[in-house]
């Protein structure tokens, strides 16, 4: 418990907090309750944190580990930009093209048609700092990790060598827009999203999010794919079950 308290008082400051309030409540009542619960908390000095930047990767990182797990798993990752970079939206769309929904490329081709994977997913970290585009999956019975990796790489090479079609790109954009709209129906999601956008910039940015995704072009996706899906920018982990 002492370690928890020490961590809390070192890194958590209400000076940094963003309070988002939604629902049937007046401004006056919001102010009253905020002052009631937060005003008594004393302000403390905020230490300046100097976080080291990760060294640029210049060669592929690869590792194989064996553990007492029921199934083999393949993990691949590629360095990407921060959420504040203009290319962030292209990365998010690339991950959706790869594995968001039954008609996405990895799901349709490698899971449903070729049956090389029992499950396969692609997603981005979405952090304020530079992050990773992740690809993780569990190969089907009888499929080696080498075969699984080769199949994924073939799909990535297709993104690098060709342009995403207009219909496929529009489908992904429409899906994102509908998710945004329905995701902001309930009060909790609205408050969470407003707080996040205020923390990372300004709350009004939430109204520009759909436009930011809509502005991504096939040419931008092609450029980002070529820059990203390179061996020297990638990390590969074979997570194998032990032969007991």
Residue spans for each PLM region:
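His/Glu-based metal-binding/catalytic segments typifying zinc-dependent metallopeptidases
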Residues: 46-103
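A general, composition-driven signal for non-globular sequence regions
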Residues: 55-56, 96, 107-108, 167, ...
């Amino acid at each position: 418990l002492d370690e928890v308290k020490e961590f809390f008082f070192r890194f958590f400051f209400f000076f940094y907090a963003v309070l988002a309030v939604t629902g049937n409540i007046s401004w006056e009542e919001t102010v009253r309750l905020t002052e009631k619960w937060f005003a008594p908390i004393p302000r403390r000095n905020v230490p300046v944190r100097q976080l080291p930047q990760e060294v640029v990767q210049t060669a592929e990182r690869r590792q194989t580990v064996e553990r007492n797990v029921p199934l083999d798993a393949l993990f691949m990752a590629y360095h990407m930009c921060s959420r504040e970079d203009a290319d962030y939206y292209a990365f998010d769309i690339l991950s959706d093209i790869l594995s968001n929904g039954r008609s996405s490329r990895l799901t349709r081709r490698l899971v449903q048609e070729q049956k090389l994977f029992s499950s396969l997913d692609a997603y981005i970290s979405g952090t304020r700092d530079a992050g990773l585009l992740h690809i993780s999956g569990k190969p089907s019975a009888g499929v080696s990790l080498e075969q699984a990796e080769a199949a994924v790489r073939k799909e990535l090479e297709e993104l690098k060598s060709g342009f995403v079609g207009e219909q496929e790109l529009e489908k992904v954009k429409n899906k994102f827009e509908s998710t945004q709209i329905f995701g902001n129906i309930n009060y909790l999601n609205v408050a969470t999203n407003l707080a996040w956008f205020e923390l990372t910039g300004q709350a009004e940015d939430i109204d520009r999010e759909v436009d930011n995704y809509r502005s991504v072009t096939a040419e931008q996706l092609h450029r980002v794919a070529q820059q990203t899906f390179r061996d020297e920018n990638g990390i590969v982990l074979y997570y194998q079950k032990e032969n007991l």
